[in-house]
Amino acid sequence: MVQQTNNAENTEALLAGESSDSGAGLELGIASSPTPGSTASTGGKADDPSWCKTPSGHIKRPMNAFMVWSQIERRKIMEQSPDMHNAEISKRLGKRWKLLKDSDKIPFIQEAERLRLKHMADYPDYKYRPRKKVKSGNAGAGSAATAKPGEKGDKVAGSSGHAGSSHAGGGAGGSSKPAPKKSCGPKVAGSSVGKPHAKLVPAGGSKAAASFSPEQAALLPLGEPTAVYKVRTPSAATPAASSSPSSALATPAKHPADKKVKRVYLFGSLGASASPVGGLGASADPSDPLGLYEDGGPGCSPDGRSLSGRSSAASSPAASRSPADHRGYASLRAASPAPSSAPSHASSSLSSSSSSSSGSSSSDDEFEDDLLDLNPSSNFESMSLGSFSSSSALDRDLDFNFEPGSGSHFEFPDYCTPEVSEMISGDWLESSISNLVFTY
């Protein structure tokens, strides 16, 4: 190894000396080695017509000026340092050819022109046809052609076996790289599609999100969550009130300005509670996605049936005069009487919490209201409020559906006492609500 490096250094020194001496060195090199036109070695081989024909009959191209010069110089380097690798010799020859002056290249250019004319005379029908490699180049060319359809097979075959394998590897790499991108595309899409629905259902948790059908999920608004509590103008509120009867589970009057459009508050005398009160969902348009939140109120199911009455089968006009009526906020407000065109089936669902037991509180109504409002799913349709024999069973079922952390942001468990309920349902709230609703 040391001897090889020493030989390389000696060769470099020799070549550097030749290039530094410019003309003299070149003349010395030319004098020491046979001239391009001499017949000693290169000239004789070039003059022989069979020098460019291989044993298989393939005709080689005529040499250019660099090939003529490099053939002479390569033989010199190989004689001086036989252990030097052929690639290293070619690298050094290329650098030296670039450093040669044009005047020094003239004799080799003339020799190359002479060889070209001789080649034309010897082979008049010659046409450059690169030979396709049969052994290893075929597989490389096939794989490269599949990876790069625009690449010609001649170009691949012209390269060496190593280059062909590198081309094939590059083609395979190019074809395999888009595959992970394509595979990760559905993941990104699925995550971006799936996440908004998970974020849009804060109250139901994973159970409510899983119970949504695609049609009901399509009805969910994709905008900001504040669009649920959209404030209506008086002109927009008038047709909404005239097209559907006014009845809903009224929530406690926290944030009344935010919720005044979503629900119509029913305050008034006890005797008026026996009048028919229909659900808003009876005539609400199920195809309107915002109707679920604005017109439909808490009791609007996707098929338009009313879920507003807590227990329509167990409610009675006599029970509506019990003190539980104040806790349910279900008496009619004198300022907004229900229209006479209420549906007949809605008259059976009187005051929302009329027959509730004394243990039930206003927070149950609030929980039920927000749960139905944020989860218009088929589970609540099957859990239709008229199918329960008593409101206590409904309370138990609603309490069972609520889990910690899955309720809406309107939960106030501290205000569950009857005293607070009576305070909230007092007469002072009626005037403030009516002012908020009708005074803009």
Curated annotation (Swiss-Prot):
Stretches for region Disordered: 1-58, 128-211, 234-258, 272-382
InterPro entries assigned: HMG_box_dom, HMG_box_dom_sf, SOX-12/11/4, SRY-related_HMG-box_TF-like
Result of knocking out the encoding gene: In T-cell-specific knockout mice, loss of mature Il17a-producing Vgamma2-positive gamma-delta T-cells and reduction of Rorc expression in immature Vgamma2-positive thymocytes. In a mouse model for psoriasis, dermal inflammation induced by skin application of TLR7 synthetic ligand imiquimod is substantially reduced due to the absence of Vgamma2-positive gamma-delta T-cells.
Main location: nucleus
Residue ranges annotated as motif 9aaTAD: 392-400
UniProt KW keywords: Acetylation, Activator, DNA-binding, Nucleus, Transcription, Transcription regulation
Superkingdom in the source lineage: Eukaryota
Composition skew (Acidic residues), residue ranges: 363-372
GO biological process, one term: negative regulation of myoblast differentiation
Subcellular location: Nucleus
Biased composition (Low complexity): 31-44, 136-148, 157-166, 234-253, 304-322, 330-362, 373-382
Record's comment on post-translational modification: Acetylation at Lys-95 by KAT5 promotes the transcription activator activity and is required during myoblast differentiation. Acetylation by KAT5 abolishes the interaction between SOX4 and HDAC1 and switches SOX4 into a transcriptional activator.
Entry domain remark: The 9aaTAD motif is a transactivation domain present in a large number of yeast and animal transcription factors.
Subunit structure: Interacts with UBE2I. Interacts with HDAC1; interaction inhibits the transcriptional activator activity.
Physiological role: Transcriptional activator that binds with high affinity to the T-cell enhancer motif 5'-AACAAAG-3' motif. Required for IL17A-producing Vgamma2-positive gamma-delta T-cell maturation and development, via binding to regulator loci of RORC to modulate expression. Involved in skeletal myoblast differentiation by promoting gene expression of CALD1.
Name listed for the protein in its UniProt record: Transcription factor SOX-4
Record organism: Mus musculus (Mouse)
Gene: Sox4
